[in-house]
Amino acid sequence: MSRIILNTKIWLFVLLFGMSFPAWAQSDDFNTWTKFKVNYKIDSRFSVSGDLELRMKDDVSRLDRWGLTVGGSYRPCSFLNLGVGYETHLRNLGDSDWKFRHRYHITATVSFRYQWLKVSLRERFQQTFDRGDSETRLRSRLKSSYAPTKGIVSPYFSVEIYQSLDDTSFWRANRMRYRPGVEIALAKRWSLDAFYCYQYASSQGRHIAGIEVGYSF
C-alpha cells in the first residue's frame, strides 16, 4: 500500500510538471500502433484474452514489430483486478534482420468511480528476454476517464512511467507516456479505442497515433 501511495504522489507531480518543458532534447519519430483484442469472460471474476498488434516506425515508412499477447485476469472485488500475460514480439532491426523477444507480466489495477469520473492506478511488473539478455521493469500508469453510466463515448487521459529494476537507481524513469484518447462502445460486443500518445525516452521521443479494436464475448 505504501508503494501505491508513493507512486500516486509521483504521478501527480508528473501530471502537473512533466509536460511543462517547451521542447524535448532529441528528434522525434512518428509511429502508428494498430491492435485487435479479443476477451472472453468465463464468469463474473475470471476472463481470458488475446491480442494481435502491428506497429510502424520511421515516420510510418517501415514496419517496427508484430506482437502477440495472451493472458488472463481475476477480479477478487469490485475495485481490484489482477492479471498475468505472456507476449512475443517479432521486431524489425533493419537490413532484413528480424528477431523474436519474449515477455511475461504481472499486473494489479485499483480503480475507483465517483459519479462520471473513473480513476485507476495500474502497477505492472514485466520481464523481457531478448537473445539471452533480460530486462526487468515496473510500469506505473495513472488513468482518469469520463465514464457516464449511460453513453457510448468515454474520453480519457493517462500517464505512464517505466522504471528499471535492473539498475541501482530505482527511481530513474526509462520511459514516459502521455496518452489522451477516447473509448467508444460500437456495439454490444465491439469497442474502439482511438488515441494519441507521446512517448518520451532519452534516446528518441515518439508521436504515436493508435487504434485498438476490441471484441468481447
Question: Language-model segments: which ranges?
Answer:
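Residues that define the transmembrane beta-barrel architecture of outer-membrane proteins
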Residues: F30-T32, D64-W66, F100-Y104, S134-L138, ...
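Predominantly the C-terminal beta-signal and adjacent terminal strand-loop region
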Residues: F157, S169, A173-F217
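Sec/Tat signal peptide C-region and signal peptidase I cleavage site
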Residues: F21-A25
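Repeated loop/turn-to-beta-strand initiation elements of outer-membrane beta-barrel proteins
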Residues: S44-G50, F79-V84, Y114-V119, K150-S154, ...
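Bacterial N-terminal signal peptides
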Residues: K9-S20
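Transmembrane beta-strands of outer-membrane beta-barrel pores
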Residues: L52-D58, Y86-N92, F112-W116, F125-F129, ...
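Residues on the lipid-exposed face of transmembrane beta-strands in outer-membrane beta-barrel proteins
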Residues: F36-Y40, V70-Y74, I106-F112, S140-Y146, ...
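Start-of-domain marker
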Residues: Q26-N81
